[in-house]
Amino acid sequence: MAKITGEEDFVYVWTLGVEGLGDGSDKLVTVDARKDSPSFGKPIRSASVGGRHEAHHGGFTDDRRQFWAAGLSDSKIFIFDVASDPSNPKLVRTIDDFVQKSGGAAGPHGAYALPGRMLIPSLSNKDGTGTAALVEYSNDGDYIATQWLPTDKEQRGARVEKIADGYGYDARVLPRKNVMLSSSFTGIENYMRPLGDVVNDPEAMKKFGQTMVLWDFHARQPKKVLHVPGVPLEIRWAWGPYNNYAFTSTALTSKIWLVYEDERGGWKAKEVADIGDPAKLLVPVDISLSADDKTLFVDTFMDG
């Protein structure tokens, strides 16, 4: 996997709309990252999508000509042209039939570039209960395929370590090993509720993911369901050409987990570090691995 080198001219930030602020809509905000620019470090443009859609994650297509941004509440996906004028992105397409075309997946979580395609992991199904899928589109926004995550009832050929809960969140690929890894969160019935209500609802707290799925990437076939309790979220594969491992953090138990290839070519998961006291509900979310694979950065949702 060739690294992206150099420095960005602009940074795109997918932002939540706030009622009473501007038009109140979600927006893609452009920040000037040119060091010699008088507006360096400042927002210079915003592209409204109209309405609030629980803006969450986004990502570039493989050719970096488009930026895809997803809304968790109504399952809309917004496609921006960032190539024609990188300083002023334009909304060129809105996908509003994600649930219908995917066969019932809902809550598109992010956008992960594949060659000529975009991979969209969902957080839920249309019923809100959490059974999730990986949905693929062409770079132009045309639906291609849906792959549902394994469950205890429908294991889809996967070997299950303990349970197959079917929850989804992130998905990342290690192409040279033909391996894709997906993680797990919770369904719409939980993530669209106020966090305080969920935490104080014992039944709701039982409905969170504790699995990661190892896939045959080319076949899109789930091979093994790893037991990773505590809600594993973001996945980051190591960069080094011989480093066959990935990290994730668990939101409810505040742990760092390692997913690695053992000496026999099998894949395993183990916890390797504590982030903090889970009783304080730090909720580690995003993680970033440095380009030399030596430093892992973790941010926490509740205390900044």
What are these language model-derived features?
Residues 7-9, 63-65, 115-117, 176-178, ...:
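Short coil/turn segments that connect the beta-strands within blades of beta-propeller domains
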Residues 42-54, 92-104, 146-166, 222-231, ...:
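Surface-exposed loop and turn segments in beta-propeller and other repeat-based domains
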Residues 1, 24, 54-56, 106-107, ...:
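Beta-rich catalytic cores
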Residues 40-113:
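Blade-loop segments of beta-propeller domains
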